[in-house]
């Protein structure tokens, strides 16, 4: 019945929203988490693992489990994924009670694997339950739930902590909400919903992709940054291994009979260009979500709530840019908006890269007529720029992929963005820590040798602030360059007149006999 499929897709969208929220929710509560698991403030780089391992699990699981649902059924895979999400949430919350950092990482990884399956399965479910001519709005709504999570996640985390006074409750709340989604799915979907001709799962391709990303992340992480080496001793061999795995992945996808994405009808130049631009946008997004708050705490000496409040300007501008970008793209085309949006974002990050230690007093003079706060203005510019490209990149990707593969193509855009987040935050964190120790060593040498103990302590504190400011300045400069590179790729995405080659196929029957397409 129509009511049943609406309940099912609502439950799937709720699950997608929860997974997206938990991708970003930790960004604004990192200080509380650090205190609970015993990470000192001078080891900020360790806490990034709660983000990177979630993203790694998410990216590794998405293509494999999405395809697995074709073989084993949407209902079964959704229920298994939701159960895994509950387990991961419980482990993460308990890690806070026990103060166990490794348990925390394990919980976040389980969460990532589970939530990575939710988006492609729910997209496929929408394609099953709605006929082709009516499914665009349904798939768009599911995608909107994913995007909404990226906007609300940081605010959701700080709100729950403000309301309940404990960061663990962010994860405990997942248990009843996910259980509700499981009950809705149980009663709204038939038990036997496997495809009559199930597709084979590209297990080799998925494992090669996960291996490449995992080796890259571990190779980039230096647990003991000393300002002399960017990478740990084992870093270079692991990065070489990641490169080999990546080459093997692309080689496999080129010649294998079963692939993550069927190349038939796909226009690969604009498709890969859109994914590349999504990687750049994802890297910039995650660097902002992580490093702006750390700048507030490490340089401006803000508390957690104040530092999270800095992000509010960026997070408000992001959806405004997304809505505006979608509206403009229908008139000017996706290519122009993607190019302009990433250039605007690059300009915003160039402004952010010049943030001084006394940022709160810094202002921009606008044509000599009036002044505006530099911090707020720069974050709004970056947020608007990144927001502008969300719709055009997704639209351009889907336009050059046959409609039968729109679900996996939508997931590919998310995978590309999260790959950018994962590799971007790992690589820039490694570079930042390397440069921080170099900068700090140079600044410390400027302390007069005859300074008193109090003067020396004050000078050291000021030097740490200055070193943090310079380090983040370099990180955001690189982020601006990444956005410029993404803008160039934006020029190569599909125009409005370029479309995929649609194969001649008949409309497939719906998932269950009792469901009638509109």
Swiss-Prot record:
Protein activity control: Resistance to ethidium bromide is inhibited by reserpine.
Pfam family, one: MFS_1
Effect in UniProt of substituting residue 417 to A: No longer complements for vancomycin resistance in M.smegmatis
One of the protein's GO biological processes: symbiont-mediated suppression of host innate immune response
Keyword Transmembrane helix: yes
Residue intervals annotated with topology Cytoplasmic: 1-6, 67-75, 131-143, 191-200, 251-269, 329-336, 402-407, 496-518
Site (Forms salt bridge with Gln-147, probably closes bottom of cavity): residue numbering on this chain: 417
Extra information: Bacterial LAM blocks host cell phagosome-lysosome fusion and is one way in which M.tuberculosis evades the host immune system.
Effect recorded for residue 140 to D: No longer complements for vancomycin resistance in M.smegmatis, in TM5
Site entry: Forms salt bridge with Arg-426, probably closes bottom of cavity: 147
Induction / repression: Part of the lprG-Rv1410c operon.
Region span, Beta-hairpin: 363-373
Domain statement: The periplasmic loop between the last 2 transmembrane domains plays an important functional role. Has a canonical major facilitator superfamily fold with two N- and C-terminal domains of 6 transmembrane helices (TM 1-6 and 7-12) and two other transmembrane helices between the domains (TMA and TMB) that form a hairpin. Between TM9-TM10 is a periplasmic beta-hairpin that extends along the membrane plane, TM11 and TM12 helices are extended 20 Angstroms into the periplasm. Asp-22 is a possible protonation/deprotonation site.
Molecular function GO labels: efflux transmembrane transporter activity; glycolipid transfer activity; isomerase activity; lipid binding; transmembrane transporter activity
Site entry: Protonation/deprotonation site: 22
This protein's GO CC annotations: cytosol; plasma membrane
Protein's recorded name: Triacylglyceride transporter Rv1410c
Site positions (Forms salt bridge with Arg-417, probably closes bottom of cavity): 147
Impact upon substituting residue 289 to R: No longer complements for vancomycin resistance in M.smegmatis
Effect recorded for residue 147 to Q: No longer complements for vancomycin resistance in M.smegmatis
Domain of life: Bacteria
């Amino acid at each position: 019945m129509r009511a049943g499929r609406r309940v099912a897709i609502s439950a799937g969208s709720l699950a997608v929203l929860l997974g997206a929220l938990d991708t970003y929710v930790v960004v604004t509560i990192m200080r509380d988490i650090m205190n609970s698991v015993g990470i000192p403030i001078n080891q900020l780089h360790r806490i990034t693992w709660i983000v990177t391992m979630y993203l790694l699990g998410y990216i590794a699981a998405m293509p494999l489990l999405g395809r697995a649902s074709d073989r084993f059924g949407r209902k079964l895979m959704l229920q298994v994924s939701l159960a895994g999400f509950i387990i991961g949430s419980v482990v993460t919350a308990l890690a806070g009670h026990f103060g166990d950092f490794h348990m925390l990482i394990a919980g976040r990884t389980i969460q990532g694997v589970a939530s990575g399956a939710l988006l492609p399965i729910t997209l496929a479910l929408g394609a099953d339950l709605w006929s082709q001519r009516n499914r665009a709005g349904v798939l768009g709504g599911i995608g909107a739930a994913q995007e909404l999570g990226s906007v609300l996640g940081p605010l959701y985390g700080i709100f729950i902590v403000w309301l309940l006074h404990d960061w663990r409750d962010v994860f405990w709340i997942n248990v009843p909400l996910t259980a509700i989604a499981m009950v809705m799915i149980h009663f709204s979907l038939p038990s036997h919903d496997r495809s009559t001709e199930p597709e084979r799962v590209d297990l080799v391709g998925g494992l090669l992709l996960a291996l490449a990303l995992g080796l890259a992340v571990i190779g980039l992480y230096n647990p003991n940054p000393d300002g002399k080496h960017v990478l740990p001793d084992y870093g270079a061999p692991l990065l070489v291994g990641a490169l080999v795995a990546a080459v093997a992945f692309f080689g496999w996808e080129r010649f294998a009979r079963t692939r993550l994405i069927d190349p038939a009808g796909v226009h690969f130049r604009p498709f890969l260009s859109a994914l590349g631009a999504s990687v750049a946008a994802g890297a910039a997004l995650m660097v902002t979500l992580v490093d702006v708050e750390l700048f507030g705490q490490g340089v401006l000496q803000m508390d957690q709530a104040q530092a999270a409040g800095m992000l509010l300007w960026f997070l408000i501008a992001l959806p405004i840019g997304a809505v505006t970008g979608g509206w403009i793209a229908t008139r000017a085309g996706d290519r122009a908006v993607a190019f302009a949006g990433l250039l605007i974002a690059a300009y915003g990050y160039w402004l952010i890269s010049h943030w001084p230690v006394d940022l709160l007093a810094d202002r921009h003079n606008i044509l000599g007529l009036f002044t505006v706060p530099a911090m707020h203005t720069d974050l709004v510019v970056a947020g608007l720029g990144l927001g502008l490209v969300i719709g055009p990149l997704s639209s351009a990707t889907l336009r050059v992929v046959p409609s039968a593969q729109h679900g996996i193509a939508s997931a590919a855009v998310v995978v590309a963005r999260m790959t950018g987040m994962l590799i971007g935050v790992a690589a820039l964190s490694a570079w930042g820590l390397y440069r921080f120790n170099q900068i700090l060593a140079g600044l410390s040498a400027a302390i007069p040798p005859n300074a008193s103990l109090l003067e020396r302590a004050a000078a050291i504190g000021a030097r740490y602030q200055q070193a943090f400011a310079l380090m983040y300045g370099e990180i955001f400069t690189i982020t601006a360059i990444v956005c410029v590179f993404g803008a160039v790729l934006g020029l190569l995405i599909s125009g409005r007149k370029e479309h995929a080659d649609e194969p001649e196929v008949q409309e497939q029957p719906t998932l269950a006999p009792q469901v009638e397409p509109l």
